[in-house]
Amino acid sequence: FTSYHNVCYFSGFLYCQFGRRYGAVLSKDGVTTISAAIDGGQPWRRSTGDNVTYTDWRRDSYFTALKDLLKGVKRLGIEFDHVNLDLKVLLEDHFPNVELVDCAAAAMDLRTIKSAEEHVLIRKGAEMCRVGGRAVMEAVKAGVPEHEVAIASTNAMVRAIADSFPFVELMDSWTWFQSG
């Protein structure tokens, strides 16, 4: 998998691309994330499975890691709705005798079946949104700039997330708000 949602769903690790490739290989034995060596070990700490970290000192190190994980593979499921043409060409170049098949719809079907734990997490996420929305309502006043309203909401949500999930590493939390 290469998409944010599938890498996260199947491994527990949500990557932030920063111009480097990320992925997750799901096999009958488990899941292994492939990550750039810029994350301070976060993929290994956050993943439910194994992790292979590659350096980008060589242009194709990502594909070297993939080849190590996929030795002998004849068919490879990729997400046609996420893999761009450049990546597809590179996969075809690096795996010349491998059939690339679309696994996006099947993966989406799997993600639609929610466990009790996922229901709890979804409700908790909705609660964080409610906290942010309430902060927006309290901050909106005549003359208050939009960025101040967004800051109030983001800060409220970050505090609520930190209180509710003290074991997570917060990243990319913000509020999109527009008045008018």
PLM feature segments, named:
Residues F1-G132:
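A composition/biophysics-driven feature that prefers long, compositionally simple stretches
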Residues V7-Q17, A104-A107, I113, E146-G180:
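Short catalytic-site patches enriched in acidic/histidine residues
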Residues K71, P96, K124-R134, E138-P145, ...:
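Generic secondary-structure signature for well-ordered alpha-helical cores
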